Amino acid sequence: MPGPNPPIEPPVEPAIDPAAYRAVAGRFATGVVVVTARAGGLDHAMTANSFTSVSLDPLLVLFCPEKISRLHAAVLEAGRWGVSVLGEEHEEVSRFFATRGREVSDRLDSWSCHRGPRTGVALLDDAIATLECRTHAVHDGGDHSIVVGEVIGVDLRRPEARPLLYYAGGYRGLDRPPGGE
């Protein structure tokens, strides 16, 4: 009588090349926002395309800041943050807030902003829309955190405006084809 069959070992998965992963992930078009928080008496801001709606009941959204970013620390400290949805004319704004290494005080002085009535955070005056959020939960996401916020204020400022999109490593508008910078 033959003995029991040896266990079948699952195949070893080859490592995924980070460049290949980025190329694939970059084929998912996203909107572009600027996320802001105020902590230690200073405004903090960064461009994000990792922003999405999560739930309607309760009203929840999320974004994913890099754990080493100043905004990450500010959001954790303040517990309140804002989102300014960028229009297709805001590519310069997006690039400005995406630049690493700038002093915090230089980030918002160049753009017209107002304070959110519920959070006191800076929100861009000419954003398509703004949201004010209170941190609901923070989850580990590798080198980023997944910050879930309860939406406590919204303002649809320019409903006719067209959104700024990010796709395949570049900015797009609804009418601009890939490669049509």
Which residues fall in each region the model found?
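Basic, polyanion-binding surface patches
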Residues: M1-E181
